[in-house]
Swiss-Prot record:
GO biological process: monoatomic ion transport; organic anion transport
Localisation: Membrane
Topology, Extracellular side: 45-137, 188-194, 247-250, 361-373, 419-429, 507-555
Protein name: Solute carrier family 22 member 20
PROSITE patterns membership: MFS (PS50850)
Source organism of the structure: Homo sapiens
Sites carrying sugar chains: 54, 114
Family: Belongs to the major facilitator (TC 2.A.1) superfamily. Organic cation transporter (TC 2.A.1.19) family.
InterPro entries: MFS_dom, MFS_sugar_transport-like, MFS_trans_sf
SUPFAM superfamilies attached to this UniProt entry: MFS general substrate transporter
Record key words, sorted: Glycoprotein, Ion transport, Membrane, Transmembrane, Transmembrane helix, Transport
Segments passing through the bilayer: 24-44, 138-158, 167-187, 195-215, 226-246, 251-271, 340-360, 374-394, 398-418, 430-450, 486-506
Length: 555
């Protein structure tokens, strides 16, 4: 008998599972706020050079005649953001006048920012514009680098230390580093603490998903995965609302970091994965956890009858060949695991490139930043409803592949939207982003089901590393737009379609119990191949019999 049978006996979908899932998914929702935070804290307001300090007019008028005389206009008739005249051009104050070839220079005395929407951002505070504009993208890349490092570190630690310890530490690290980011006043310190925050993103997501999935019965894993997606949707909507109410970037940074101190405090009462405890010889603690689960689910008597011997009868066949010392090579050692790993590398990387390419630069759509953020969050709800139905009734593989391919096609189609139609362009991009967000959540669940328990955390961490590489690559792909406007959408769309094709190679896991060991995984694949071969053989024999039967002559 399997461990899932033991969960069924103790109440597989009771009050414990509901409370446990809610407490783990709430922090995941707020992580979405941190992921997209720089859309607001690093927003670039309209700006232009400050006039020369040695002119008395500079202190009296930065918007009228003085502005027209000192700042050239760009092609759209707005003040040039990065250049100013070397000397005031008073002749420009005359109607319909122009001075072609007037000498200009950089913004030696700083910039004047429009603070009507954003009273303060890191761009204003450290002048991350013009020649320094790449530092803004660098800050986001540093955050994504932290997510990348965290995926490798926390994925490996969880296999050795369990899920609970790294999760508790991640909550504390995020609360502390988030507060420090809001406190320190240097750009270098900002980047350091954003890196530490990025690390916790992986630590929280990977361990939360594993704890939710491993305490869920087979029939509840799909719902748990979809709830994770809804928590991300809620987090994006919360970000839009909180950012609208709290405009200064330091206050906003602190406001979305402080709740993780509360998550840190209650996380001490979350139980460790009993699967992991059993695999690492801590059966007594596993029994105690299962007894608490049984009591909370109204199965106290069943829990009291649970002993090490009874538990071993459920799991003996599954854990007999478990080796608790695993390395990254185990992800490539056997054929079945190797195929899963290679496909997931492509899927996670490509999905991430397309997703962050759309979602991390909302100002390019030309609409209200708060409105676009809310729209990009709301669109996830119908996408998740469709994903829920298809994952339950159709399967994981078809759902993920369809969403990825559809998203890729929509991103490429956005190239053909006429200029000046911001609403149509934003709506189409939002639909593509909804498909990518849904596929991302489905892939988290799918990955956890594809890998066996003994290397599940390592596998999810390794796959997540490639997603973070994709997140690092997305800003670089965006810069290709300076050479050709078609390169970014073609790149994002093509990678999404490639990921969808890679999904088709994987095995369907709908309504299948979690595999505990690598050996069991190989046996399942071989048995599946043998069964398919037998079915094909049987079908071939039946067709041969049909051709030879008298019935054929009457058709």
């Amino acid at each position: 008998m399997a461990f899932t049978d033991l969960l069924d006996a103790l109440g597989s979908m009771g009050r414990f599972q509901l409370n446990h899932t809610a407490l783990l998914l709430l922090p995941c929702g707020l992580l979405a706020c941190h992921n997209f935070l720089q859309n607001f804290t690093a927003a670039v307001p309209p700006h232009h050079c400050r006039g020369p300090a040695n002119h008395t007019e500079a202190s009296t008028n930065d918007s009228g005649a003085w502005l027209r005389a000192t700042i050239p206009l760009d092609q759209l008739g707005a003040p040039e953001p990065c250049r100013r005249f070397t000397k005031p051009q008073w002749a420009l104050l005359s109607p319909n006048s122009s001075i072609p070839g007037a000498a200009t220079e950089g913004c030696k005395d700083g910039w004047v920012y429009n603070r009507s929407v954003f009273p303060s951002t890191i761009v204003m505070e450290w002048d991350l514009v013009c020649e320094a504009r790449t530092l803004r993208d660098l800050a986001q890349s540093v955050y994504m680098a932290g997510v990348l490092v965290g995926a490798a570190v926390f994925g490996s630690l969880a296999d050795r230390l369990g899920c609970k310890g790294p999760l508790v530490w991640s909550y504390l690290q995020l609360a502390a580093s988030g507060a420090a980011t809001a406190y320190f006043s240097s750009f270098s310190a900002y980047c350091v603490f954003r890196f530490l925050m990025g690390m916790t993103f992986s630590g929280i997501i990977l361990n939360s998903v594993s704890l939710v999935v491993e305490w869920m019965p087979t029939r509840g894993r799909t719902v748990a995965g979809i709830l994770l997606g809804y928590s991300f949707t809620l987090g994006q909507l919360i970000l839009a609302g909180v950012a609208y109410l709290i405009r200064p970037w330091r206050c906003l940074q602190f406001a979305i970091s402080a709740p993780f101190l509360i998550f840190f405090l209650y996380s001490w009462w979350l139980p460790e994965s009993s699967r992991w405890l059993l695999l690492h010889g801590k059966s007594q603690l596993a029994v105690q956890n299962l007894q608490k689960v049984a009591a909370m689910n109204g199965r106290k008597e069943e829990g009291e009858r649970l002993t090490k011997e009874v538990m071993s009868s459920y799991i003996q066949s599954e854990f007999a060949s478990v080796c608790t010392s695993n390395s990254i090579l185990d992800l490539f050692r056997t054929p079945a695991i190797r195929k899963v790993t290679c496909c997931l590398m492509v899927i996670w990387f490509s999905n991430s490139v397309a997703y962050y390419g759309l979602a991390m630069d909302l100002q390019k759509f030309g609409l209200s930043l708060y409105l676009v953020q809310a729209l990009f969050g709301i669109i996830n709800t119908p996408a998740m409803l469709v994903a829920t139905a298809t994952m339950i009734y159709v399967g994981r593989r078809a759902t993920v592949a369809s969403f990825l391919i559809l998203a890729g096609l929509m991103v490429i189609a956005n190239m053909f939207v006429p200029e000046g139609t911001q609403i149509l362009c934003t709506a189409q991009a939002a639909l593509g982003k909804g498909c990518l967000a849904s596929s991302f959540i489905c892939v988290y669940l799918f990955t956890g089901e594809l890998y066996p328990t003994e290397i599940r955390q390592m596998g999810m961490g390794f796959a997540s590393v490639h997603a973070r590489l994709g997140g690092l690559t997305a800003p670089l792909v965006t810069t290709l737009g300076e050479y050709s406007t078609i390169l970014p959408p073609v790149s994002f769309g093509a990678t999404a379609i490639l990921a969808g094709l890679a999904v088709c190679v994987l095995t369907e896991t709908r309504n299948m119990p979690l595999v505990e060991t690598i050996a069991a995984m190989e046996r399942r694949v071989k048995e599946g191949s043998s069964k398919k071969h037998v079915e094909e053989k049987s079908e071939e024999i039946s067709l041969q019999q049909l051709r030879a039967s008298p019935l054929k002559e009457t058709i």
